[in-house]
Amino acid sequence: MMNERAQHLLKALIERYIADGQPVASKTLSLLPGVELSSATVRNVLADLENMGLIASPHTSAGRVPTARGYRLFVDRLLTIRPLDELSRHELEANLQPDSPQRIVQAASSLLSELTSFAGVVLTPQRSDVAFRQIEFLRLSERRVLMILVTLDGDVQNHLLVTERDYTPSELIEAGNFINQHYAGQGLSAVAQRVESELKQLQGDIAELMAAAVKLGQQTLAKRSEDVVVSGGSRLLQVHDLSDDLSRLRELFGVFERKTELLKLLAQGREAQGVNIFIGEESGVMTLDECSVVTAPYCINGQVVGTLGVVGPTRMAYERVIPIVDITARLVSNALSFRE
């Protein structure tokens, strides 16, 4: 169990290291405002912190640097979050207005990178059920019908239906009008249940067409592949902690390009309540063992549909990055929900 003095020194050491990137010597710590301890006392406390695995001594320096475990304790128990400055908040609010989901996601990714100087990442929206705005059927040829489905998100899906019999254009118009009149604005799952229970009220063949259309729409939308939008990966070239190792940096860019590891990591963040932080090896991605990933889920009308965040070095200003990610997630949620 760490005493208050040890916690105070660990906090001071990590804040100093985050600020200038140089290993922190005991003498430097003893001279910081509020420490009021001798160099000898500070050395003893630092030795204890090193034995606990919270700090380490680089071979080339007499000073100490925080370990991933030290950063974890700092973030969980010692960090003081600062309110986001008005200029940054205004930039986020001005650029995350209701728009198409694609534009909102791209804007969020770019803003996260711009405001943190790291890589901004956004897992694209995925919903267990999708509400539709309009459906239309077009006859292509005998027993071949094109279904055009427009979701409330503005997404347009075209699906080919191979039907049991040939339908006339008037029958297809009738089916489309009925669905739009009675079911528009509802999720496809709810529509499927209602169509099944209300089949007796409809002409048999038309009902079969509608049921097949709704089922195909559900299946196709469920299969839409998730994607990650990455912005500002090149900014990490300016991060001294990462750019010194070009081989590791190339591997990191490979993670951004493949996206597979990021997809899994951001999917974990979707289950979190609020901001989630992966420090070093906690991400489970070997290439990110010198990075921290700060994420937060975003919603559409209360339903979590994706995750966004920042990838940067473990030596990052967490007190600033965390509120940026948190507020961005809230604004993205508002912008996407407002559209509906």
From Swiss-Prot:
Keywords, alphabetical: Repressor, Stress response, Transcription, Transcription regulation
Disulfide partners: none
Stretch forming the signal peptide: none
GO molecular function: DNA binding
GO BP terms in the entry: negative regulation of DNA-templated transcription
InterPro entries the UniProt entry points to: GAF-like_dom_sf (IPR029016), HrcA (IPR002571), HrcA_C (IPR021153), WH-like_DNA-bd_sf (IPR036388), WH_DNA-bd_sf (IPR036390), WHTH_HrcA_DNA-bd (IPR005104), WHTH_transcript_rep_HrcA_IDD (IPR023120)
Superkingdom of the source species: Bacteria
Record carries keyword Repressor: yes
Family annotation (PANTHER family): HEAT-INDUCIBLE TRANSCRIPTION REPRESSOR HRCA (PTHR34824:SF1)
Stated family: Belongs to the HrcA family.
Its job: Negative regulator of class I heat shock genes (grpE-dnaK-dnaJ and groELS operons). Prevents heat-shock induction of these operons.
Alphabetized HAMAP family for the sequence: HrcA
This protein's name: Heat-inducible transcription repressor HrcA
